[in-house]
């Protein structure tokens, strides 16, 4: 068998090759007229890929499906069970072919947050140690709001000619999750985001977008260090 040069390249710790980073977003979901339907997937993929470049960990790509709360209907999503099964399938394949022993899931879609309840099941079924990183969700603000618009500007995926229409909430009620009354009543954070968009509107700031992305990337890099320090599976 060929002996791999695990110390080759800009690699500070050869054990980083045993860590995988994979994006989890949403590919089929409305974000207002200024943002593409796969905004969450593209943002999560950028964060995961950049963290992979900077850390040396393996970039595993992106999970295709996404989950959403039943009271929020702004896209095409799957059940939590189906999402869990898909993650298990993908990670089993990555473990088999890439010899990883732990994974960081970079989550860029709030509707995926319930996956935290199935992480133990995913670990048991894959034999991998899993870290779920949702830093960007914690930082970006309302759905389709200034945070996502600014990151989209930094990534070059925004239609700036449509920003002025982003707060036409009668037509694009998914922005800020404004039109989802039940979700707003059930979750104070959703209600706060909806009111923020309604009362304050949105803006685009390239520097702010870059700062949000860097904050999220650094958070993933910290998770890589934690996995290395804990000697996960090594």
Curated annotation (Swiss-Prot):
User: According to the UniProt entry, what is the EC number of this protein?
Assistant: 3.5.1.102
Task: Report residues binding Fe cation 1.
Answer: 29, 40, 109
Cofactor: binding comment: Requires one Fe(2+) ion for activity. Requires an additional second metal ion that could be Fe(2+) or Zn(2+).
Which keywords appear in this protein's UniProt record, sorted alphabetically?
Hydrolase, Iron, Metal-binding, Zinc
Q: Which GO terms describe its molecular function?
A: 2-amino-5-formylamino-6-(5-phosphoribosylamino)pyrimidin-4(3H)-one formate-lyase activity; ferrous iron binding
> What cofactor is needed?
Fe(2+); Zn(2+)
Residues that hold Fe cation 2 according to the record: 31, 40
As its record notes, the protein acts as a catalyst of: 2-amino-5-formylamino-6-(5-phospho-D-ribosylamino)pyrimidin-4(3H)-one + H2O = 2,5-diamino-6-(1-D-ribosylamino)pyrimidin-4(3H)-one 5'-phosphate + formate + H(+)
Cystine links in this protein are none
Pfam families, sorted: Creatininase
Entry keyword annotation includes Hydrolase: yes
Q: Which GO terms describe its biological process?
A: F420-0 metabolic process; riboflavin biosynthetic process
> Which InterPro entries does the annotation name?
Creatininase-like_sf, Creatininase/forma_Hydrolase, FAPy_deformylase
- Pathway, per UniProt? Cofactor biosynthesis; coenzyme F420 biosynthesis; Cofactor biosynthesis; riboflavin biosynthesis
Superkingdom of the organism of origin: Archaea
Do you know which PANTHER family this protein is assigned to?
Answer: 2-AMINO-5-FORMYLAMINO-6-RIBOSYLAMINOPYRIMIDIN-4(3H)-ONE 5'-MONOPHOSPHATE DEFORMYLASE, 3-DEHYDRO-SCYLLO-INOSOSE HYDROLASE
Into which family does the record put it?
A: Belongs to the creatininase superfamily. FAPy deformylase family.
Q: What does the subunit section of this Swiss-Prot or TrEMBL entry state?
A: Homodimer.
Purpose of the protein? Catalyzes the hydrolysis of the formamide of 2-amino-5-formylamino-6-ribosylamino-4(3H)-pyrimidinone 5'-monophosphate (FAPy) to form 2,5-diamino-6-ribosylamino-4(3H)-pyrimidinone 5'-phosphate (APy).
Protein name, per record: 2-amino-5-formylamino-6-ribosylaminopyrimidin-4(3H)-one 5'-monophosphate deformylase
């Amino acid at each position: 068998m060929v002996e791999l040069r695990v110390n080759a390249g800009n690699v500070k710790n050869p054990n980083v090759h045993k860590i995988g980073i994979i994006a989890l977003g949403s590919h089929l979901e409305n974000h207002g007229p200024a943002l593409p339907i796969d905004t969450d997937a593209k943002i999560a993929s950028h964060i995961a890929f950049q963290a992979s470049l900077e850390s040396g960990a393996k970039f595993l790509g992106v999970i295709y499906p996404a989950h959403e709360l039943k009271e929020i209907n702004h896209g095409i999503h799957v059940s939590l069970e189906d999402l869990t099964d898909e993650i298990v399938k993908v990670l089993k394949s990555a473990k088999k072919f890439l010899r990883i022993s732990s994974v960081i899931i970079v989550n860029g879609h709030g509707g995926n947050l319930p996956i935290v309840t199935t992480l133990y099941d995913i670990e048991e079924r894959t034999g991998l140690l899993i870290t779920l990183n949702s830093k960007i969700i914690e930082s970006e603000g309302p759905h389709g709001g200034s945070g996502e618009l600014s990151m989209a500007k930094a990534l070059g995926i925004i239609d700036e000619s449509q920003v002025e229409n982003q707060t036409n909430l009668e037509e694009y009620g998914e922005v800020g999750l404004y039109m989802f009354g039940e979700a707003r009543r059930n979750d104070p954070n959703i209600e706060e985001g909806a009111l923020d968009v309604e009362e304050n509107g949105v803006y685009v700031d390239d520097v702010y977008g870059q700062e949000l992305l860097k904050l999220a990337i650094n958070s993933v890099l910290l998770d890589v260090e934690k996995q290395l320090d804990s000697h996960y599976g090594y």
